[in-house]
From Swiss-Prot:
Belongs to the non-disulfide-bridged peptide (NDBP) superfamily. Short antimicrobial peptide (group 4) family. Probable antimicrobial peptide. Shows dose-dependent and time-dependent inactivation of herpes simplex virus type 1 (HSV-1) and dose-dependent inhibition of HSV-1 viral attachment to host cells. Scarcely suppress an established HSV-1 infection due to poor cellular uptake. Residues 1-23 form the signal peptide. One of its GO terms (cellular component) is extracellular region. The keyword Signal applies. Keywords: Amidation, Antimicrobial, Cleavage on pair of basic residues, Secreted, Signal. It comes from Euscorpiops validus. The modification Isoleucine amide is found at residue 36. Expressed by the venom gland. This is Antimicrobial peptide Eval418.
């Protein structure tokens, strides 16, 4: 019974440490974002250029060739 209680307490302490470290990293990231500002972080998403709404006939033909 003592061993089970000790294992439970160690597991609770480790889980609490993980939860607190996640909050710490979140605060550090928010501080860095605040220092850089919105202009510095505006163009971090490179996937915006990938999703183009306007596909030409050549683009569609190229995609068809890729899918073969």
């Amino acid at each position: 019974m003592r061993t089970q209680l000790a294992v439970l307490l160690v597991a609770l302490v480790l889980l609490q440490m993980i939860a607190q470290s996640e909050a710490l990293w979140g605060e550090i990231w928010n501080t860095v974002k605040g220092l850089i500002g919105k202009r510095g972080l505006r163009n971090l998403d490179d996937l915006d250029d990938v999703f183009d709404d306007d596909l030409s006939a050549a683009d569609l033909e190229f995609l068809k060739q890729l899918m073969r």
